[in-house]
Structure formats: C-alpha cells, structure tokens
Amino acid sequence: MEYKSNQHRQMAKVKNILSQIFFPKRLESYSHESYSGSCGAHAQWSLNPENGELRITGTGPLYDFFGEKEVPWESHLNHIRKVVAHGITYIGFQTFSYCKSLSSVQLPDTLTGIGQHAFAYCKSLPSVLLPEGVKHIKDYAFAHCYHLQELTLPTTLKSIGKAAFCSCHGLN
C-alpha cells in the first residue's frame, strides 16, 4: 500500500512539472528527433535536414553500430544525401548502411579503415574516392551498392575483406 502511495505522489510531481511548460503560440510542430550528437568517443555528427548533408567531425574512430548501439541518425537514413567527414580515422560497423539516398561521400585523409557493412545497401552511391592512408576495408563494406560505378583505391591499401564489393553491379 505504501508503494502505491509513493507512486501516486511521484506522478503528481511529474504532472505538476509538466504543467509548467509553456510553448510559444506560433509553434506549429515539435519533434523529438535529433539532428546532432556523438558518434565516437571524440566524434560528433550533425544533419542538415534541408539538404540531407550529414557532417562528421572530430578525431579517432567512429563507433561500431550493432546490438544495443543504434546508428544515431537511424530515423533519417532515407534523407541522408551527402556525407562529409573530417578528422576521423575509422568508419565503424554499419555506420552508413541503408542510407538509400546517399549519393556523395567526402572522406578525410586521416581515414585508415572502413568497417564491416559500413556503406552496405547505399543504393544511390555512384562513386567513392578512398583517400591515401586507408589500409583496410572490412567484409561487406560496400556490399549491395548497386549503382556504384567508380571506385578509386589508395596505394596504401593492405587488405580488402570478404565480399566487400559484392552486388556492386556497376563495377567492372
């Protein structure tokens, strides 16, 4: 009985706090979606919803996104048209996979590796220029990029993982 009484008091406090939030009269909509945040220990992202440009800045590797760790721009996957990255060293597991509208990627010269499935199913991506310094491309990194027609590999490349470019029908 004591538990329910405490629970009711807590709910009353929450209702009181929420009743003190005032929104401007001209506010037409409110979204809980995020357009910026963290994507690595020292890396941040921001998305311009107007033009679909996703900017990644910072240093070091991006997170690997699997299991409990979801891609922070998950709700915007279909709207991302361009990725511009600065300062990062590694693109993690599934970082940009399923960005079906992605048509342009600018990767930094600090990049040394591309993780598994990093760009998998980016069906609109026509070309990729991997900068000098990239040493490793992991399994399925660009798998199912059906429109990928142009790929420039760096001289620093040491390994290409299994099926890294499978179902990239535009590559000869």
Model-derived features with residue positions:
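A subset of signal/propeptide-processing and intrinsically disordered low-complexity segments
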Residues: M1, M11, K25-L27, Q116, ...
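N-terminal capping/linker segments that flank leucine-rich repeat
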Residues: M1-Q94, D109
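Structural signature of tandem-repeat unit edges
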Residues: H8, I21-F22, G52-G60, L77-Y90, ...
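Compositionally biased, low-complexity segments
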Residues: K15, K25-L27, K100, A120-K123
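Short, flexible coil/linker segments at or flanking structured domains
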Residues: E33-Y35, H42-Q44, V71-W73, L107, ...
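Secreted/extracellular small peptides and ectodomain modules produced from precursors
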Residues: Y35-G37, S97, A120, A143, ...
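Residues at secondary-structure transition points
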Residues: A43, D64-F66, Y121, D139, ...
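Consensus positions within tandem repeat domains that build extended binding/scaffold surfaces
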Residues: G92-T95, G115-A118, K138-A141, G161-A164
